[in-house]
């Protein structure tokens, strides 16, 4: 009879303890084996066994994970699976619940790839700081690839269509097999050392991980990272990733895309050149028009400031001044002539002849000779007095005695005092036999 002091478990309790023990002891395991008893019910989950020659274990891969498998599971296929051990408590069966599964050969390569990638990344081989930009204009390109593969045909076709002037050297190499990595590395190092190329393109078409394994070589990755010439890697399809992609300065998803990255489209270049020419022509016309306008303004200013222009201006001013002077002189002369005529008329009105005739008539009327003689003498004396009085006030008499009538040349006004004058005034002096023009040097009063 059982000892009642020991713990008594139910089947569910025992299975729970066993499940906890399994899950705690085996958090994550990798198993390589063959598939057996593969079933996929309507739920989308995948059930099978992993087996070898001596044992097997039940496995489950639920729909969220099984949907992403890259192969079709089938009987006898050797796989590499990763999962957690657990126990299905309802039946007491222990099983492996998988979250990843791949074909066995590719899985080993994948693990080696991930380990090498992590190590090179830790060393800084893939650091973005050391990557070089592609040159703006690629003139000479080296293409390391198989000379008979689809990749080289795609690259050359795109280059010929987009930019046929590019110089392209095909450096033929194996792209698959044991010696491919060493050959690609050697060609890369020689092309880089030559200094002949602006860019080096390493490329091949798609394939399995094993087919592309040459591009996961450590020596090749380090050679790409150390190259002084920018390196473009275009290996496989868009979903394929290799260490050469990580090490290269630029990674292209396909060979065709790599060719498009390296050269511009000649049609786009022609269009850009034409647009640039049009802008340059407009700029030239605008600049030339502004320059011509500026030159015209300078020419006008130069002509305005030239000695000939200034001489013409002085000549015009001199002619204007001469016309003005002649007009003023004519005006002054006319005024003087009018004054002389008025003076002459006054003299004539007091002429002795005019007074003598009436006197003679009066004398003839008066027969007495003596009385007539006295009266004649008296009248003659009176007449002479009148003549002297007229001559004393006559301007002509004043001028005849050596004096001059002085007027301003500017307006013809008569100068009556030295105080009216300033240095530099231009005057006209009317003399008995003509006139002279004088300039005031100094003036004194008193």
Curated annotation (Swiss-Prot):
Q: Name one GO molecular function term.
A: nucleic acid binding
**In its keyword annotation, does this UniProt entry include Ubl conjugation?**
no
CDD domains this protein is in?
Answer: ExoVII_LU_OBF
Pfam families from the UniProt entry: Exonuc_VII_L, tRNA_anti_2
What this protein is reported to do is described as: Bidirectionally degrades single-stranded DNA into large acid-insoluble oligonucleotides, which are then degraded further into small acid-soluble oligonucleotides.
Family classification: Belongs to the XseA family.
Subunit info here reads:
Heterooligomer composed of large and small subunits.
Name recorded for this polypeptide: Exodeoxyribonuclease 7 large subunit
Q: Which organism is it from?
A: Xanthomonas campestris pv. campestris (strain ATCC 33913 / DSM 3586 / NCPPB 528 / LMG 568 / P 25)
Q: What is the lineage of its organism?
A: Bacteria, Pseudomonadati, Pseudomonadota, Gammaproteobacteria, Lysobacterales
The gene for this chain is xseA
């Amino acid at each position: 009879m059982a000892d009642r002091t020991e713990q008594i478990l139910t089947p569910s309790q025992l299975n729970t303890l066993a499940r906890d023990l399994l899950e705690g002891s085996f958090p994550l395991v990798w198993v390589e084996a063959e598939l057996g008893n593969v079933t996929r019910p309507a739920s989308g989950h995948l059930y099978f066994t992993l087996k070898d020659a001596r044992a097997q274990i039940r496995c489950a891969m639920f729909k969220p994970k099984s949907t992403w498998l890259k192969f079709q599971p089938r009987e006898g296929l050797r796989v590499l699976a990763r999962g957690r051990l657990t126990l299905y408590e309802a039946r007491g069966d222990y099983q492996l619940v998988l979250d990843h599964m791949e074909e066995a050969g590719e899985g080993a390569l994948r693990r080696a790839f991930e380990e090498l990638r992590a190590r090179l990344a830790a060393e800084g081989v893939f650091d973005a700081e050391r990557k070089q930009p592609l040159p703006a204009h690629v003139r000479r390109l080296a293409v390391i690839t198989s000379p008979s593969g689809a990749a080289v045909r795609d690259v050359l076709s795109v280059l010929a269509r987009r930019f046929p002037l590019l110089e392209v050297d095909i450096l033929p190499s194996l792209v698959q097999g044991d010696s491919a990595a060493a050959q690609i590395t050697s060609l890369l190092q020689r092309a880089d050392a030559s200094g002949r190329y602006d860019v080096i393109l390493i490329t091949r078409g798609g394939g399995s991980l094993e087919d592309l394994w040459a591009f996961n070589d450590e020596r090749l990755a380090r050679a790409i990272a150390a190259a002084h010439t920018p390196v473009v890697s275009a290996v496989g399809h868009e979903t394929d990733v290799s260490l050469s992609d990580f090490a290269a300065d630029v990674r292209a998803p396909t060979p065709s895309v790599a060719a498009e990255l390296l050269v511009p489209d000649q049609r786009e270049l022609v269009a850009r050149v034409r647009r640039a020419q049009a802008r340059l022509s407009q700029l030239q016309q605008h600049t030339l028009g502004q320059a011509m306008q500026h030159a015209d303004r300078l020419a006008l200013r130069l002509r305005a400031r030239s000695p000939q222009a200034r001489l013409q201006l002085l000549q015009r001013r001199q002619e204007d001044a001469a016309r003005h002077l002649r007009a003023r002189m004519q005006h002054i002369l006319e005024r003087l002539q009018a004054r002389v005529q008025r003076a002459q008329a006054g003299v004539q009105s007091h002429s002795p002849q005019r007074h003598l005739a009436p006197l003679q008539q009066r004398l003839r009327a008066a027969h007495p000779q003596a009385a007539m003689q006295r009266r004649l003498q008296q009248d003659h004396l009176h007449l002479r007095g009148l003549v002297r009085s007229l001559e004393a006030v006559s301007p002509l008499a004043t001028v005849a005695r050596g004096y001059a009538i002085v007027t301003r040349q500017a307006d013809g006004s008569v100068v009556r005092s030295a105080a009216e004058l300033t240095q530099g005034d231009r005057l006209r002096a009317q003399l008995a036999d003509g006139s002279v023009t004088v300039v005031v040097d100094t003036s004194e009063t008193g």
